[in-house]
């Protein structure tokens, strides 16, 4: 069938060239195939239609220069060879091809080879070709079609690779020149770039980021100058909370907004609160570390009526000496059996050191080493404090004059057999 069609086309082409020398007036009228205003549908093309079309084509070529008349046969072959039917329905049968080609006969453009000129490109004719003509077309011819119209058409058809087109059996893609919306193979969503790549993605309203300030960059922290900081600190010393009127005045003075001043004062109050809290925590820690030594409050004050007293005679005596003169230490209350044991003692350590004899008389300086030796090993606290029970010979060895024979308490505390007062010189009052 294909061979027969080729032979028929060649015979018709010869007829057209022979009749091109004497154009007839019957073909000077507009052919119904070119009538784009009417809505009549052209039926399937017959053999006579093809012959009349080629005759009409030759008559149109006769209107141009003599160069076109000499090469009329060549132009006729090119025009038939390079025109594609854009509305084929993927069938190789000639009957289906004729039926489908009539649907998109109107509103089409001429696609010719590079050998033609611009004046010939402006002419229009229906797209009528056959499968054999399309298969003979090479890749270079397809690229030249796009260049003939100023590069408006890409080499690939609707973004589909040429390899994919060649692998499809029994199908032929539509020409890029055909833009009729009634075409069956036309896809409005097909990309215009080769390889199926989009030139630019479409933008829709739902693709925008939600939010009034979505396009704005987040504002950074406000940097205050030294002058602004000093003025704000000065104002904070007088008023920790600003009124609206004063805040407006500061905003005009310091070239800041009211919101910036308000935030600065909030941060400053929070900073002050943290500083006060830190000072309180330090004071609590110091209170827990302080014991009897260096304390303003004597730990013996809480033990006035405690059962630790040997004779239960109160807090005057050794505890007063320990709290005042020594300033702490082991504050267990010890005293003699008689009240006279406390007469020579006082809460002031200095007075005790001056009046150790209990009678107001002077006393010699006690040797420090001998004092420690005499009171280091004491059988009991009571014997240490009560001079009546002590051995007078041992006391005299320490060069201490006991005028009235009263207790020999010299301002030291013997706790658990060890002296707690060291390095003290006892001079006369």
Swiss-Prot record:
Task: List the molecular function annotations (GO) for this entry.
Answer: DNA-binding transcription factor activity, RNA polymerase II-specific; RNA polymerase II cis-regulatory region sequence-specific DNA binding
The superkingdom listed in its UniProt entry is Eukaryota
Q: Which residues form a coiled coil?
A: none
Keywords assigned: Developmental protein, DNA-binding, Homeobox, Nucleus
Renumbered to this chain, the Basic and acidic residues biased-composition regions fall at 124-143
Which biological process annotations from GO are given for this protein? anterior/posterior pattern specification; regulation of transcription by RNA polymerase II
Expression sites by tissue: Restricted to the posterior 16 midbody segments. Expressed in the dorsoventral muscles, which arise from the septal mesoderm and lie in the groove of the intercaecal constrictions.
- Region Disordered: start-end pairs: 1-32, 117-221
Q: Where is it located?
A: Nucleus
Return the PROSITE patterns for the record: HOMEOBOX_1, HOMEOBOX_2
Biased composition regions of type Low complexity, renumbered to the chain:
1-26, 169-182
Which residue ranges hold the DNA-binding region? 217-276
A Gene Ontology CC term for this entry? Answer: nucleus
| Protein family | Belongs to the Antp homeobox family.
- Role description: Sequence-specific transcription factor which is part of a developmental regulatory system that provides cells with specific positional identities on the anterior-posterior axis. May play a role in midgut regionalization.
Instruction: From the Swiss-Prot or TrEMBL record, give the protein name.
Output: Homeobox protein LOX2
Taxonomic source organism: Helobdella robusta
This protein's encoding gene? LOX2
């Amino acid at each position: 069938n294909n061979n027969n069609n080729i032979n028929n086309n060649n015979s018709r082409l010869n007829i057209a060239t022979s009749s091109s020398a004497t154009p007839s007036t019957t073909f000077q009228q507009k052919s119904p195939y070119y009538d784009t205003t009417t809505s009549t549908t052209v039926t399937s093309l017959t053999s006579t239609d093809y012959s009349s079309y080629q005759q009409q084509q030759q008559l149109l070529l006769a209107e141009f220069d003599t160069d076109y008349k000499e090469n009329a046969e060549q132009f006729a072959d090119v025009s038939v060879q390079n025109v594609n039917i854009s509305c084929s329905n993927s069938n190789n049968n000639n009957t289906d091809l004729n039926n489908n080609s009539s649907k998109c006969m109107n509103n089409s453009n001429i696609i010719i080879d590079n050998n033609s000129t611009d004046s010939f490109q402006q002419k229009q004719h229906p797209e009528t070709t056959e499968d054999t003509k399309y298969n003979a077309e090479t890749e270079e011819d397809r690229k030249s079609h796009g260049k003939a119209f100023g590069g408006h058409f890409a080499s690939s058809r609707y973004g589909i690779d040429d390899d994919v087109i060649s692998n499809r059996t029994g199908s032929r893609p539509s020409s890029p020149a055909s833009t009729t919306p009634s075409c069956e193979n036309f896809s409005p969503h097909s990309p215009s770039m080769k390889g199926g790549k989009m030139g630019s993605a479409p933008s829709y309203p739902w693709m925008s980021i939600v939010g009034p300030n979505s396009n704005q960059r987040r504002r950074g922290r406000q940097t205050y100058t030294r002058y602004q900081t000093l003025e704000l600190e000065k104002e904070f010393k007088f008023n920790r909370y600003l009124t609206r009127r004063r805040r407006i005045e500061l905003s005009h003075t310091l070239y800041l907004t009211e919101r910036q001043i308000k935030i600065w004062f909030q941060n400053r109050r929070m900073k002050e609160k943290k500083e006060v809290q830190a000072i309180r925590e330090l004071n609590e820690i110091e209170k827990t570390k302080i014991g009897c030594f260096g304390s303003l409050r004597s730990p013996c004050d809480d033990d006035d009526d405690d059962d630790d007293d040997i004779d239960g005679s109160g807090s005057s005596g050794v505890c007063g000496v320990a709290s005042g003169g020594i300033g702490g230490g082991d504050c267990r209350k010890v005293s003699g059996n008689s009240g006279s044991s406390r007469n020579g003692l006082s809460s002031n350590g200095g007075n005790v050191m001056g009046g150790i004899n209990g009678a107001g008389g002077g006393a010699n300086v006690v040797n420090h080493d001998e004092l420690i030796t005499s009171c280091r090993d004491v059988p009991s606290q009571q014997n240490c404090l009560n001079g009546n029970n002590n051995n007078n010979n041992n006391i005299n060895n320490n060069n201490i004059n006991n005028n009235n024979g009263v207790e020999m308490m010299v301002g030291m505390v013997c706790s658990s057999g060890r002296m707690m007062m060291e390095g003290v010189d006892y001079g006369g009052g």
